[in-house]
Amino acid sequence: MSEEDLRSITVDSYQLRQARSYYAEHIKINGSYVIDVCKHTGDLSLSSHGLSVGDPLLIRGRIQSRHRSSTRYFIYILIDKAVQVDEEKDGVDSVSGYSCSCPNGLRTVGCCAHVATDLWYLGFGRHQSEILIPEKFLNNVCEELGGQEQE
């Protein structure tokens, strides 16, 4: 999934900028970004909810609230693995639905920054050889400045 594909889902670049920042906060804690995959998608009654998915893959993510340390949001993304990405269809077409437990998580246009974070990581971030994390860059600058003698 390209960043352009992600922009078409988020409708705004703000959520994508936030996605990299949320990702950086989460890997800072234990060095990994954890996403759960539902193994029993055949047990889901998706058609009763108006969802037509050929080969469903349900993903769940967890993101800590930036504003309240005791609040964790759950993100659910439904992907149709049967969608073949080619010249006519891109990665966006394989995303059948998404939801987040945050106050803005059930948007009808675009998605919240939490959903954008998981989509960014799954579709783009994890395929990069290196992800520039703003905080690491700032930490290195502070270390370099701290090592210099003051006059």
Ranges and model annotations:
Residues M1-E151:
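Long, low-complexity, compositionally biased intrinsically disordered regions
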